[in-house]
Amino acid sequence: MTAQSIDNILSSSEKNVKQWYVVHTASGAEKRIKEDMLRKIAKQNMTHFFEDILIPVFGVSEVKRGKNVKVEKKLMPSYILIKMNMTDKSWHLVKNISGVTGFLGSKTTPKALTESEIQNIFNNLEAEAKEAKNSKLYEVGEIVTVTDGPFETFMGTVEEIDQEKNRLKVSVAIFGKATPIELNFNQVKKND
């Protein structure tokens, strides 16, 4: 950081204002880097500069070797979010951790995220987690009940699942004849 950029940042940092920053890391090293940061922060007695360090992940169920396993997917691979008080000392601590390639922003002036940007990240994380949960809720051949629309309370069998559009093709009996209808995931529920 240059003296001028540090001075600009210090004007808000001296008030002990913690803001969210994005740190770029080596690919696949996010967890190790977070652990290294936490160790160095504690070792250098700088916990008062840092409020939170997050790796934006969400859990999904995947089938591996015939078994359903829960795995973590990264919303922003190679990035870590840090809520910190940006000072020359805290900047150097983060920047000098092995695997950190830099802060989002210019080379000398890290750019803090706005409230709307950080809210957008958290909303995306929540949406991804919800979508991942919904995408594994239904299986072909499963019996479901329609909960919304003109076929509400009808029972049917899942014929197709469109993960991309969060839609199902469900076969319901209308006048004694199996009729396929397309529904959103949130328009059906599993039968117990």
UniProtKB/Swiss-Prot annotation:
Gene3D superfamilies: 2.30.30.30, NusG, N-terminal domain (3.30.70.940). PROSITE patterns: NUSG. Pfam families: KOW, NusG. GO terms for biological process: DNA-templated transcription termination; regulation of DNA-templated transcription elongation; transcription antitermination; transcription elongation-coupled chromatin remodeling. Belongs to the NusG family. Participates in transcription elongation, termination and antitermination. This is Transcription termination/antitermination protein NusG. It comes from Rickettsia conorii (strain ATCC VR-613 / Malish 7).
